[in-house]
């Protein structure tokens, strides 16, 4: 009977996989018949320690973990895909799902202990606070002063076009939900965003969907710098880079900080397992320091007191740039700045 159920599960999974652009996938077998289906934007090498820790306390529960882009995740949940838990760094898209009725409420002692700014109506829960950073190639910047503000970065790029031609990476915000969130929030916070975008646009910038690939391309020498990537991913890559090829910079004028969030989709079946994983994540999220975990907890912004951190608030204001007219206007301005060739 169990084999028949597993066979049916695999058939259903195969049809689901064919409908999604999956970046990675892994099945963590438990000793029982229950399966927790997780859809997430977090790379496996970053999130695997959390899944292993959770499964050690829930050994009978199997975990089916699927990695997709934030926009794929949003579409999957909105279309009723059979996932029990959705974890995303694109907090605006997560909030939109919760606001539009695609999330199920969850209440526990762990979620009740979260500050008000880290949860909304028992539907969406933040468990990390992750800054956007600049990752640069130490070789490509040899002989140059390292920028500490966007204006200094503008000056360096403008004064050395031959060094940075085709070697600047950033998000393609048309496809990346996280990239769009970073861009819109930064544009609201500082006029320097558009000045920097225009200078990048003259240098034939390379556009990406994800932080991980940008960081790898800096480490491999294909890029001189990657702009607005997740600091947690950059720190993980830096820890594995023994050659000193990569350096992380936080802009001192302003640094966006996103909250990675969790929701239980309204289509979820394994709500008990989903709630238990949320509880573990939010408990870890209330630590004072990262410790041995890859992702930084809520409220932790590192040790550099010179950096002006600007946390993006969890609330209805997140949906302003998701309005179709606002989105189209922003993307038009972004394309004019970044695609000048």
Where are these regions (language model features)?
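Early extracytoplasmic/lumenal segment of secretory-pathway proteins
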Residues: 19-96
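Extracytoplasmic ligand-binding site segments that recognize negatively charged/polar headgroups
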Residues: 41, 48, 77, 90-94, ...
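Short amphipathic alpha-helical coupling segments at ligand-binding clamshell hinges
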Residues: 50, 192, 196, 269-281, ...
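A bilobed periplasmic-binding-protein/Venus flytrap-type ligand-binding module shared by bacterial periplasmic
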Residues: 133-140, 183-184, 258-270, 289-292
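A ligand-binding cleft/hinge motif common to bilobed small-molecule-binding domains
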Residues: 92-97, 219, 223-244
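Short beta-strand->loop
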Residues: 103-112, 123-126, 239-256, 265-267
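Extracellular/periplasmic bilobal clamshell ligand-binding domains
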Residues: 305-341
